[in-house]
Swiss-Prot record:
Organism of this sequence: Sulfurihydrogenibium azorense (strain DSM 15241 / OCM 825 / Az-Fu1)
Stated name of the protein: Ribosome maturation factor RimP
Subcellular location: Cytoplasm
GO CC, any one term: cytosol
Family: Belongs to the RimP family.
One Pfam family here: RimP_N
Length: 147
């Protein structure tokens, strides 16, 4: 099992305790490896949320000894300008304002702004002025939160 998958498994009960969602896990190797965990709280991700997750997963990782060298653990929110990296994010951020860019024009447009309705059967649903726009996932080049 990959490190990220094992960390995800260990994080699950920690996140559930606080009603948090896992957005992404990155493990960057090098001279000083970094394990980055991105979390989301639908009510607004706070420093307390990040600290809570960091302390708990840090203790568990020390006991499990998954990373055999010293490393830096970072827990944060996804950030304002972060692009979606996985399809789960289309449902994690349901109800949030997003900007979707397509690879080619759809109805003469390549940029769509609206409220994310979610992802279903490979179709991203976006509400614009009370009209739901459906965009095939394979036509999307980039999606990010719109603040």
């Amino acid at each position: 099992m990959k490190l990220e998958e094992k960390v995800k498994e260990l994080l699950s009960p920690i996140l559930e305790d606080r009603g948090l969602k896992l957005v992404d896990i990155e493990y960057i190797t090098g001279k000083r490896p970094v394990l980055r965990i991105y979390i989301y709280n639908p009510e607004g991700t706070s420093i307390d949320d990040c600290e809570y997750v960091s302390q708990r997963i840090g203790s568990i990782l020390d006991v499990e000894d998954l990373i055999k060298t010293s490393y830096t653990l970072e827990v944060s929110s996804p950030g304002l300008d972060r692009k979606f990296k996985n399809i789960e994010e289309y449902n994690i951020f349901k109800g949030k304002d997003v900007v979707v860019k397509t690879k080619e024009p759809i109805e003469d447009k390549k940029i769509f702004k609206g409220i994310l309705e979610g992802l279903e059967d490979g179709i991203v649903k976006l509400k614009q002025d009370n009209i739901v726009v459906e965009i095939p996932l394979d036509k999307i080049s980039q999606t990010k939160l719109d603040f």
